[in-house]
């Protein structure tokens, strides 16, 4: 098949395989014009030229009344999917932050202790109010602990999990304790036990 430069009207001999089904970018070797050439199934074949041209015409410029030459076939432009790359980078960044938080948690919150747990009714028969004492046995200030409560049935299966970030401004000074409460609605009727633990943000994400 042959193609024509839109700028200088110079014709070039190419093969269908060089252009491809989806087309590709080409560059005129005469005027250096760039354009996107699509495959035209209606173009004349090489055998339709009055002066038959052999396959060497693909490599060597040919001078005839068609003024045929050889174009510069540019490499296919790679398509980069930006959104998946950015999304993956965001997920990796969040995981790194959570892992850093986990390491801080291991060395910081292991001195907290939950004591004096009491349970009462909350609003209606399906609700529960949990009162507990949170003690800081360390020599430093601890802020914003995350408390996770699991509701368990008689077979020790977890029926639900509830988290309390203790009002986001909780401060527990060294060797001191505070009293907190957590309200839970719609407790399953098959609930038998509750489990109260101290967790970090990574634990909340994969709970």
Curated annotation (Swiss-Prot):
Question: So which domain of life are we looking at?
Answer: Bacteria
For this protein, the record's InterPro entries field holds: Znf/thioredoxin_put
Q: Does the keyword Membrane apply?
A: yes
Q: Where are the transmembrane segments?
A: 82-102
Q: How does it sit in the membrane?
A: Single-pass membrane protein
Its keywords, alphabetically, are: Membrane, Transmembrane, Transmembrane helix
Q: Where in the cell is it found?
A: Membrane
Instruction: Tell whether DNA repair is among the UniProt keywords.
Output: no
Taking the first listed entry, what is the main subcellular location of this protein, grouped into a coarse class?
membrane
Q: Which Gene Ontology cellular-component terms appear in the entry?
A: membrane
UniProt protein name: Uncharacterized protein RP193
Name the species this protein comes from: Rickettsia prowazekii (strain Madrid E)
């Amino acid at each position: 098949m042959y193609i024509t430069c839109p700028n200088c009207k110079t014709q070039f001999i190419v093969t269908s395989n060089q252009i491809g089904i989806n087309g590709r970018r080409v560059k005129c070797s005469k005027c250096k014009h760039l354009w996107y050439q699509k495959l035209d199934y209606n173009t004349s074949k090489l055998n339709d030229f009055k002066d038959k041209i052999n396959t060497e015409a693909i490599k060597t410029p040919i001078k005839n009344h068609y003024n045929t030459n050889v174009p510069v076939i540019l490499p296919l432009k790679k398509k980069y999917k930006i959104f998946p790359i950015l999304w993956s980078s965001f997920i990796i960044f969040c995981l790194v932050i959570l892992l850093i938080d986990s390491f801080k948690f291991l060395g910081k919150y292991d001195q907290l202790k939950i004591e004096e747990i009491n349970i009462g009714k909350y609003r209606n028969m399906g609700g529960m109010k949990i009162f507990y004492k949170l003690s800081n046995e360390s020599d430093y200030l601890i802020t914003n602990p995350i408390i996770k409560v699991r509701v368990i049935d008689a077979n020790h299966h977890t029926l639900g999990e509830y988290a309390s970030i203790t009002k986001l401004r909780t401060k527990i000074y060294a060797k001191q304790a505070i009293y907190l409460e957590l309200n839970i609605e719609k407790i399953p009727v098959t609930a038998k036990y509750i489990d109260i633990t101290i967790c970090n943000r990574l634990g909340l994400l994969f709970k």
